[in-house]
A protein has these predicted regions:
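Register position in tetratricopeptide repeats
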Residues: 76, 110-111, 144
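Residue-level recognition of tetratricopeptide repeat
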Residues: 38, 72, 106, 140-142
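Start-of-helix register in tetratricopeptide repeats
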Residues: 65, 99, 133-135, 140
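N-terminal leader/linker segments that initiate helical-solenoid repeat arrays
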Residues: 24-65, 69, 76
């Protein structure tokens, strides 16, 4: 099962920017790829979105979609514990989301709850066993939670080809 592109790409971009800012200028790896003005504008927009979604949640506390959008927004703001809490609320409201909730695994990873992240990616494999990106996240989580040796032993096996660059990355 493929993830919706509009959610996957922004989450990947934010994950990369949050974990290790990349530089457009190789000569200055400390320079952030986005201007300070652009970062402030994005942060302000996300903060406003959190306020609006919080009000919507007060009005309709059982709407899973509001928690989903607010959790994503908290993730973009690098407020990973709040992101996890909203993803957890989604699962509380709709138990069917538990297995398929890969975003919760990424939020747990950045919240430094590596065991929970590894578990989420493990159960996600039962939902979608051809998603090599999930296997990479699981490996990262297991390496942080249990060590590199156990993570290597726990590598998921894939029988079906996946989109590049994931097969190549997985071979590393």
């Amino acid at each position: 099962m493929r993830r919706p592109f509009p959610i996957t790409l922004p989450l990947l971009v934010v994950a990369l920017l949050v974990s290790a800012p990349l530089s457009a200028h190789a000569e200055d790896p400390t320079k952030h790829p986005l201007s300070e003005k652009k970062r402030k504008m994005m942060t302000s927009a996300w903060q406003q979105q959190v306020k609006e979604l919080t009000e919507q949640i007060k009005q309709q506390p059982d709407r899973v979609g509001f928690y989903s959008r607010r959790a994503d927004t908290y993730f973009f703001l690098a407020q990973f514990d709040k992101s996890v809490a909203d993803y957890q609320k989604m699962v509380e409201l709709d138990k069917k989301l538990d297995t398929s909730h890969w975003r919760r695994g990424i939020a747990w990873f950045y919240a430094k709850d590596f065991k929970q992240a590894a578990h989420q990616f493990e159960i996600y494999d039962n939902f979608d066993n051809v998603d090599r990106e999930n296997g990479i996240w699981r490996f990262f989580s297991q390496a942080r939670a249990y060590g590199l040796k156990k993570a290597r032993q726990g590598l998921l096996k894939y029988k079906k080809d996946d989109r590049e660059p994931f097969p190549s990355v997985y071979k590393l």
